Amino acid sequence: MSVPQPTPLRLDTLPDSNEPFAMKLSLSARIAEKFSAKREASISLATLADIAVENGYHALCMRASLIGIHTPRAEVLEAARMLRERGLGVSMVTGDFPIPENSDDGPTALRNITPYLDLAQAFACDLVRVALRKDEDIAWAQRAADAARERGMRLAHQCHNKSLFEQIEPSIDVLRRIGRANFGLTYEPANLELCGEPYGRATIERFAPHVFNVYLQNQRLHPAAKSLMVTWCNGNVPFDQIAVHEPGGIDFPEIMQTLVALGYDGTVTIHDASLGRPREDAARNAAYLRSLARFAPVGQSVAS
């Protein structure tokens, strides 16, 4: 009996030249935020951009702590110009605070998606992060995806606790119910682990047709951990946040090997929370992931 081949993961609209695969490396603005305050940046966008350039990142993943829908248009355009001059793209935009805070107001963006699309478009980015917490959000997600499609843009939901995307099969069912080709998933293994779900090769293959983006953050789960994650499906889970390059957490070698095997040529975003050492961790995380897989040459666009 033949085994069906998994659907290749693809983010790029065109094949990359001279590359068997060409993942791009993105640095999340989350590393620039204060550890316990997602609304406050501890370093400037210019400093974060310099760190990204110094360490061979292709893009930043933009968050509202630096630039959001609340930011004056002139400031947005100046930020976009600054990133272009540094040769950095923007891999995805999270345009407000309720989405990363995962509050009940997170899905509000779906009801008026235009400002989020405008913000992403200013950065020549076609991917916007959104949030769904209740079944009633699905119809709004369909409308928002339709509006995004008219502008050649896409929406993505992260694997995330306390959302409709906590578990594998329910996530796939929600994607099926939304039923829009431009609405997909940001694969993120740490939240899957917190929710008691497997996150390795079989999961990536299951999610493959829907993956628009990859987020990587790291953690250690143990009873004496300092942090507690509340989930709907797995109760309260103690964990310690650690940097991507630190051992004893998520199995990144398996994840990267699977992405390579599936021909993934999209963006891999280091989504570390700030541990008070953004420059050091950004450098060590990039070096670690490059030791696990081949990435596109620096200077190649995230949308090429």
Annotate each PLM feature.
Residues 45-52, 76-80, 113-117, 138-145, ...:
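Generic structural signal for well-ordered alpha-helices
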Residues 34-41, 63-75, 98-109, 132-139, ...:
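Acidic-and-aromatic substrate-binding clefts and catalytic sites of carbohydrate-active enzymes
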Residues 27, 33, 59, 93, ...:
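Acidic/histidine-rich catalytic cores of soluble enzymes
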